[in-house]
């Protein structure tokens, strides 16, 4: 036995927070942004007893407040001609346990200036704040795409004045994140009819926010990848019980209908999914079992 090895300090760092999954001719890389506890009380439409049973059965970790520890991820999608980022993470908007997308992008071998397109699913800080770094464009060569409905709503001072204490700070965060791209003419506030990005189709998934959008990227040969956004927050519960909703949803009824519809589409069409709040890397498929829908995570594979 080598005493030098026996007495050396143990490894205390986690492996880099990225995971590469080929999808047809795409290279999809999950980028870990961090983790945060979501309150159990924000899960609605299901009894607390049933929800807690599902959390326990799935060994879901909790934080010091007994909140459900939830992963936050963004997705790099590389086509033969594009470097697309689906969501950009939190940056400094939500504290030290989040904000690692840009760092993990670089660890994955891609420089921020190589990103040409950022597709933001919605204007909440954990998806939007990361486009900006210290008041400047964090991705200086990228165009940012965000649904016009979300741009209009989350930059409005009138809506800000009417918002409750939970949502009120999010308006300034959205304006600050978007500002440098607006000033540079690099923000595209799109409608479903006006959206034009090669190889990408928008799927309207409103409910969580006014303009929430999922992005379906064509990997050819029948392979497609869906950047889902916030259709799911509590995976252990909302896959088998998609009628369970999340308190901050703008329109819970619509969010539930969207969740059921997109789960069925993804199941029938066998799309690859990138789910921002499913356990990292959040890449996999949606299947079915006797309870309902189920999450089937991607397997770690050798790259060829």
Locate each region found by the language model:
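Short acidic/His/Gly/Ser-rich catalytic and metal-binding motifs that mark active-site loops
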Residues: 95, 153-156, 235-239
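Active-site metal-binding motif and surrounding structural segment of the metallo-beta-lactamase
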Residues: 73-74, 96-145
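Divalent metal-coordination and catalytic microenvironments
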Residues: 25, 77, 87, 115, ...
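Active-site metal-binding loops of divalent metal-dependent hydrolases
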Residues: 33-34, 88-91, 123, 149-150, ...
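Active-site environment of divalent metal-dependent phosphoester hydrolases
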Residues: 16, 123-130, 195, 209-212, ...
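Metallo-beta-lactamase
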Residues: 3-102, 106-110, 114-117, 148-204, 222-229, ...
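Cap/insert and terminal regions of metallo-dependent hydrolase folds
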Residues: 216-304
């Amino acid at each position: 036995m080598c005493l030098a090895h026996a007495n050396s300090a143990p490894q205390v760092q986690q492996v880099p927070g990225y995971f590469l999954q080929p999808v047809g001719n795409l290279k999809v890389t999950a980028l870990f942004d961090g983790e945060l506890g979501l309150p159990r009380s924000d899960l609605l439409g299901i009894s607390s007893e049933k929800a807690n049973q599902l959390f326990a059965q799935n060994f879901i970790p909790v934080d010091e407040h007994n909140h459900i520890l939830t992963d936050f991820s963004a997705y790099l999608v590389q086509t033969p001609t594009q470097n697309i980022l689906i969501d950009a993470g939190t940056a400094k908007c939500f504290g030290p346990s989040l904000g690692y997308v840009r760092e993990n992008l670089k660890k994955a071998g891609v420089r921020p200036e190589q990103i040409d397109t950022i597709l933001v699913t919605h204007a909440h800080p954990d998806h939007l704040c990361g486009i900006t770094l210290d008041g400047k464009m964090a991705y200086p060569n990228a165009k940012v795409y965000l649904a016009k409905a979300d741009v209009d709503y989350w930059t409005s001072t009138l809506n800000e004045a009417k918002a409750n204490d939970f949502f009120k700070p999010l308006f300034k965060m959205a304006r600050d994140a978007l500002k440098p791209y607006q000033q540079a003419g690099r923000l595209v506030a799109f409608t479903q009819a006006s959206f034009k990005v090669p190889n990408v189709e928008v799927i309207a998934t409103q409910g969580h926010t006014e303009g929430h959008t999922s992005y379906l990227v064509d990997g050819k040969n029948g392979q497609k990848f869906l950047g889902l956004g916030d259709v799911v927050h509590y995976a252990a519960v909302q896959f088998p019980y998609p009628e369970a909703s999340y308190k901050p949803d703008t329109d819970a009824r619509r969010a539930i209908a969207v969740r059921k519809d997109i789960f069925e589409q993804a199941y029938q069409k066998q799309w690859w999914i990138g789910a921002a709040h499913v356990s990292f890397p959040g890449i996999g498929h949606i299947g079915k079992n006797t309870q309902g829908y189920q999450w089937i995570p991607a397997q770690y594979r050798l790259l060829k």
